[in-house]
């Protein structure tokens, strides 16, 4: 599996290099942009000092534009009447009711698996603005797309979660891997990835002859697996619930499995199945770029709807926590801090408790994954500075390579803790795949580390004998054996929020890293 990922990265590196050259050699025919915004709901918040606008952004991507060359499958994605690839993304704006008081600073928060992101009290007090917009286009669970998302009447869509409607490659098939862990009993069990459904249906849920269900009795993080056998295809079936003897039809996600002998919690069930209709997930990456670019630079959309913050955004900072911070690192690596007119999108970037990337530009990608065995997210460079990948014998590269070429790199603050170092591969970004030396940090990156802390920090209750054990990152992995450290990360996060804001607005250097 790792060899396959390395080959994939080599191919993408070649494509990326060509795209970078093309970026300066070819003028785009048209610009990827948001063509229309629809505000579905407006509410007063913060004692009427702020407004919250909830809506949808309709956008188009030119598949021939070099800025979009890294989007996997964009060349075969369905096109609209303009010959472009279309998307619809959710957005939420929180802005001062009196926009003459707006500070000019916009925080572009990355939704985590479709969820909301709160705005800190000091940001409200400073009259900063907040934008959240959808990027995860797998249309499953917490990122489900409303059925009537393309309705053009304001108010016709009720906001429930963040999403982006991405194109579907109807009729395309391929193999997908799913795993069922820590489950028992005779009832059906779902194919999930970190709590949300695996977003791909089997080609034919009544026929499993193309698929293989394997039992693992043990495995380690470095891929040492003990196989406990293969379940005969006649002893399991796809179902929408029920049992093997009385299965329900598959009509909605999550797809579930029913076993003749039931599930055993001491075993891991690994399914490789023939799936259909993948999403062009990388369109969601470009949507995040373009929605921010619209609210920062546009006066109005093509229908004449005014940009509610037109001319008020002087500085933008993107911020993401955990999965959302990982995708932020991914976007920087792809060069997506430059919009279609060559302008910088965000002056600052803050990946929080995030040390890897997200497979949101792969056919059959599962962006909800947390680097379980065989999950993508660690392929290619994970470090900021250009540096060789010794173990996988890859050429030198870094997350900032593309934005360095276009002079659109943001100022970066990264904050992490012990959980990220020990559980989600963070240390690769510090010392590379051949851990002989620390990789130097570029001048525009500041790193802060909170040793021994859990993912997101503890509750701050400094009891001598904490009772709870730390949870394990993964799909239904349960808890570990070591007690959870109560040390909080709140103070570090609060301090770094102010430090990053000062750094990008006034040039004030952050504390020593």
Features from the language model and the residues they span:
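Bacterial N-terminal signal peptides
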Residues: 16-25
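Short, functionally important structural connectors and interaction interfaces within domains
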Residues: 15-16, 437
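C-terminal His-loop and adjacent cap/lid subdomain of alpha/beta-hydrolase
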Residues: 31-513
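N-terminal secretory signal peptides that target proteins for export/translocation
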Residues: 1-11
């Amino acid at each position: 599996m790792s060899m396959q990922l390395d080959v994939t990265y080599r191919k993408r590196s070649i494509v990326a290099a060509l795209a970078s050259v093309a970026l300066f050699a070819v003028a785009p025919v048209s610009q990827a942009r948001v063509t229309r915004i629809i505000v579905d709901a407006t509410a007063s918040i913060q004692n009427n000092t702020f407004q919250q606008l909830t809506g949808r952004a309709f956008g188009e991507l030119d598949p021939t534009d070099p800025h979009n060359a890294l989007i996997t499958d964009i060349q075969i994605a369905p096109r609209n009447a303009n010959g472009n690839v279309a998307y619809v993304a959710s957005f939420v704006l929180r802005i001062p009711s009196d926009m003459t008081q707006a500070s000019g600073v916009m925080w572009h928060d990355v939704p985590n698996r479709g969820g909301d992101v709160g705005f800190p009290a000091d940001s409200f007090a400073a009259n900063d603005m907040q934008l959240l917009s959808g990027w995860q286009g797998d249309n499953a669970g917490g990122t489900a797309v409303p059925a009537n998302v393309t309705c053009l009447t304001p108010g016709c869509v009720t906001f429930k979660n963040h999403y982006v409607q991405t194109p579907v490659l109807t009729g395309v098939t391929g193999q997908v891997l799913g795993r069922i862990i820590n489950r028992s009993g005779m009832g059906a069990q779902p194919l999930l990835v970190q709590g949300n459904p695996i977003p791909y249906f089997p080609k034919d849920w009544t026929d499993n002859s193309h698929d293989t269900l394997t039992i693992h009795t043990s495995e380690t993080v470095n891929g040492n697996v003990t196989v406990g056998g293969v379940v005969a295809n006649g002893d399991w079936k796809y179902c929408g619930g029920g049992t093997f003897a009385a299965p329900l039809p598959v009509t909605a996600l999550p797809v579930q499995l029913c076993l003749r002998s039931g599930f055993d919690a001491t075993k891991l069930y690994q399914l490789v199945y023939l799936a259909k209709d993948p999403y062009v997930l990388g369109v969601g990456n470009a949507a995040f770029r373009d929605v921010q670019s619209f609210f920062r630079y546009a006066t109005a959309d093509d229908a004449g709807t005014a940009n509610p913050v037109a001319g008020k955004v002087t500085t933008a900072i993107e911020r993401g926590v955990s999965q959302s911070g990982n995708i932020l690192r991914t976007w920087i690596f792809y060069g997506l801090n430059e919009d279609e007119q060559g302008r910088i999108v965000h002056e600052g970037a803050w990946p929080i408790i995030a040390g890897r990337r997200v497979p949101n530009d792969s056919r059959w990608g599962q962006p909800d994954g947390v680097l379980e065995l065989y999950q993508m997210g660690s392929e290619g460079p994970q470090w900021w500075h250009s540096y060789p990948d010794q173990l996988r014998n890859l050429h030198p590269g870094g997350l900032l390579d593309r934005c360095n070429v276009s002079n659109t790199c943001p100022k970066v603050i990264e904050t992490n803790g012990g959980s990220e170092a020990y559980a989600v591969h963070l240390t690769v970004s510090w010392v590379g795949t051949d851990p002989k030396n620390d990789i130097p940090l570029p001048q525009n990156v500041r790193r802060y580390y909170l040793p021994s802390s859990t993912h997101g920090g503890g509750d701050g209750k400094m009891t001598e004998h904490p009772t709870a054990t730390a949870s394990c990152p993964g799909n239904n992995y349960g808890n570990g054996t070591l007690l959870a450290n109560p040390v909080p990360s709140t103070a570090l996060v609060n301090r770094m929020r102010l430090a990053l804001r000062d750094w990008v607005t006034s040039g004030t250097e952050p504390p020593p890293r």
